[in-house]
């Protein structure tokens, strides 16, 4: 067995021992030893391998897999620009704290600077965006030292896993594992009895690291009029569920929220203090409240850092030790304002003469059922879902909120669906299987349309429906400063970016079923039986979005 093959097999074995169950592989020559080792592990049923030709979409596929499975996922690629194409996914994984492992095959380091083909300084390429950048070093052709080399390779792999999962830091995130490989890059004809150097007995990792306990209790008196703002990455806090909670769709508060609070109700209330969970990013009324110097803010997070955009946080910890109880009059007032806000949004939707992205979001929200997984685009869709009063009871909601880019949304949804469909708690049944429903805008869909490319031999979601709210451009800019009517002569082109893409034709090019439907037929289409991946396009208007949102605000 040649050194590169031996090293690759050891690394793959140790990754599996450390909890890796899904790996995304992009084809190349230099990463061939890893590719052969991964294929062997897939054939043996130890991992599930996903082959993709585009490293950018592969990275987001891995993010979807990792988020939905709650486990580290690897992406393996060859050297050069293949590594650079992981940049967007690495940045998202950094800020969303996703355990993404970049297995970057490299040329031998002595070739750097020589002009060798497909060679660049890729170790450390991701800079501060990764938790660690670890090099394994070239495998030596030294059979007499194989036991020592085996220990070195396995120990390094464990360090990669610990950094990615945050076992010692409570701060999961991406890691680059750079592995220079020398020819030969394919397995030798092996003599009978050739074996890979073994790991610890019983399938245990080479170096066991228990999960760190990160606990910083914070005493908070709930007798003051309090609201909870739960953003992306919020932990579950059972002792706070009796408070009014403004929960972003990805916050895990569906079944634990007897007092939901609509974000548009906040300006109608005057809370005396705020408990902030996770990292809220969606709503301007929330940002305004968190920035109010007269309102104390207590930040509770699941890791060592806490968000504080306005610099207004009074204290930070990981859990609340509560004293006092909320006043019934305050809870009643919040409940009334919540219902008023939801009713206002829905009544204005009914009165509006055109179909907008908000209408599409409302139709999707009303069609969901317990056991579903919902993946939301990072621009208007995730905000629209919060505004139409989505109930997340029994629903898993995902969205790329790390840096909130629209790139990779299709691939993220596919990865999330693949992970969800084989999760232990998957609620599917033969008569009514649980689904993954993705709601994304047309720009996000077109931007990541290559994510639809799944080879005929690759794992494919069996219950994924992608709803494309197509308003032919960037609808979110209609609601920002750039959407000011006085700028309309130029803003449509440079911000709205109309594209006129035929979504159905794009789907057909990738052999994906897709069709255009009316918004009032969306529930029926989502409930249609069948397996596989489908795209449902709903035409929407963005020219009246500013008017619709203004009408909602005025009615409130």
Swiss-Prot record:
Classification via InterPro entries: MenaQ_synth_MenD, THDP-binding, Thiamin_PyroP_enz_TPP-bd_dom
Its EC number(s): 2.2.1.9
Entry superkingdom: Bacteria
Keywords of this entry: Magnesium, Manganese, Menaquinone biosynthesis, Metal-binding, Thiamine pyrophosphate, Transferase
Disulfide bridge partners, by residue number: none
CDD domains xref list: TPP_PYR_MenD, TPP_SHCHC_synthase
Coiled coil: none
Cofactor: Mg(2+); Mn(2+); thiamine diphosphate
Gene Ontology terms: biological process: menaquinone biosynthetic process
Pathway entry: Quinol/quinone metabolism; 1,4-dihydroxy-2-naphthoate biosynthesis; 1,4-dihydroxy-2-naphthoate from chorismate: step 2/7; Quinol/quinone metabolism; menaquinone biosynthesis
MF terms in GO: 2-succinyl-5-enolpyruvyl-6-hydroxy-3-cyclohexene-1-carboxylic-acid synthase activity; magnesium ion binding; manganese ion binding; thiamine pyrophosphate binding
Cofactor note: Binds 1 thiamine pyrophosphate per subunit.
Catalytic activity: isochorismate + 2-oxoglutarate + H(+) = 5-enolpyruvoyl-6-hydroxy-2-succinyl-cyclohex-3-ene-1-carboxylate + CO2
Gene3D superfamilies: 3.40.50.970, TPP-binding domain
PANTHER family hit by this protein: 2-SUCCINYL-5-ENOLPYRUVYL-6-HYDROXY-3-CYCLOHEXENE-1-CARBOXYLATE SYNTHASE, PROTEIN PHYLLO, CHLOROPLASTIC
Subunit structure, as described in the record: Homodimer.
Family indicated by similarity: Belongs to the TPP enzyme family. MenD subfamily.
Function: Catalyzes the thiamine diphosphate-dependent decarboxylation of 2-oxoglutarate and the subsequent addition of the resulting succinic semialdehyde-thiamine pyrophosphate anion to isochorismate to yield 2-succinyl-5-enolpyruvyl-6-hydroxy-3-cyclohexene-1-carboxylate (SEPHCHC).
Protein's recorded name: 2-succinyl-5-enolpyruvyl-6-hydroxy-3-cyclohexene-1-carboxylate synthase
Organism: Mycobacterium leprae (strain TN)
Gene, per the UniProt record: menD
């Amino acid at each position: 067995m040649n050194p590169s093959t031996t090293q690759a097999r050891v690394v793959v074995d140790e990754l599996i021992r450390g909890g890796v169950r899904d790996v995304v592989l992009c084809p190349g020559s230099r990463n061939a030893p890893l590719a052969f080792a991964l294929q062997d592990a897939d054939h043996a049923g130890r991992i599930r391998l996903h082959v993709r030709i585009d490293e950018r979409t592969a990275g987001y596929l891995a993010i979807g897999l990792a988020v939905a499975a709650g486990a580290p996922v690897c992406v393996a690629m060859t050297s050069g620009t293949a590594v650079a194409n992981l940049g967007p996914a690495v940045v998202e994984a950094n800020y969303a704290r996703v355990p993404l492992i970049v297995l970057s095959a490299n040329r031998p380091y002595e070739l750097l600077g020589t002009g060798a083909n497909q060679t660049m300084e890729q170790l450390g390429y991701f800079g501060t965006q990764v938790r660690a950048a670890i090099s394994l070093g070239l495998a030596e052709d030294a059979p007499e030292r194989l036991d020592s080399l085996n220990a070195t390779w396995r120990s390094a792999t464990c360090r990669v896993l610990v950094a990615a999962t945050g076992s010692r830091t409570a701060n999961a995130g991406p890691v680059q594992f750079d592995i220079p490989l020398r020819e030969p890059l394919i397995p030798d004809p092996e003599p009978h009895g050739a074996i890979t150097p073994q790991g610890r007995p019983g399938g245990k990792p080479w170096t066991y690291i228990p999960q760190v306990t990160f606990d910083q209790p914070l005493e908070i008196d709930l007798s003051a009029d309090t609201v909870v703002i739960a953003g992306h990455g919020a932990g579950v806090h059972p002792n706070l569920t009796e408070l009014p909670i403004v929960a972003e769709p990805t916050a895990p508060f569906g079944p634990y929220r007897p007092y939901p609070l609509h974000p548009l109700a906040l300006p109608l209330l005057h809370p005396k203090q705020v408990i902030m969970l996770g990292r809220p990013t969606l709503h301007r009324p929330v940002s305004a409240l968190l920035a109010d110097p007269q309102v104390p803010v207590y930040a509770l997070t699941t890791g060592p850092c806490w968000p504080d955009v306005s610099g207004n946080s009074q204290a930070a910890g990981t859990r609340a030790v509560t004293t006092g109880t909320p006043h019934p009059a305050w809870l009643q007032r919040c409940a009334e304002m919540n219902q008023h806000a939801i009713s206002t949004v829905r009544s204005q939707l009914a009165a509006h003469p055109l179909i907008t992205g908000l209408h599409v979001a409302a139709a999707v929200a009303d069609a969901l059922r317990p056991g579903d997984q919902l993946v939301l685009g990072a621009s208007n869709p995730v905000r629209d879902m919060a505004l139409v009063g989505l109930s997340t009871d029994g629903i898993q909601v995902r969205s790329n909120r790390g840096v909130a880019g629209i790139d990779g949304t299709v691939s993220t949804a596919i990865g999330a669906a693949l992970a969800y469909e084989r999760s232990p708690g998957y609620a599917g049944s033969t008569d009514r299987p649980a689904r993954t429903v993705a709601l994304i805008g047309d720009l996000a869909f077109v931007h990541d349309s290559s994510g639809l490319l799944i080879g005929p031999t690759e794992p494919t979601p069996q219950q994924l429906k992608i709803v494309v709210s197509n308003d032919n451009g960037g609808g979110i800019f209609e609601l920002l400063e750039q959407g000011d009517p006085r700028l309309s002569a130029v803003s449509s082109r440079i911000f709205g970016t109309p594209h006129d893409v035929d979504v159905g034709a794009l789907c057909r090019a990738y052999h994906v079923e897709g069709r255009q439907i009316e918004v009032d037929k969306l529930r029926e289409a989502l409930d249609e039986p069948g397996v596989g991946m489908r795209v449902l396009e709903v035409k929407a208007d963005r020219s009246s979005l500013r008017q619709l949102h203004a009408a909602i605000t005025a009615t409130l």
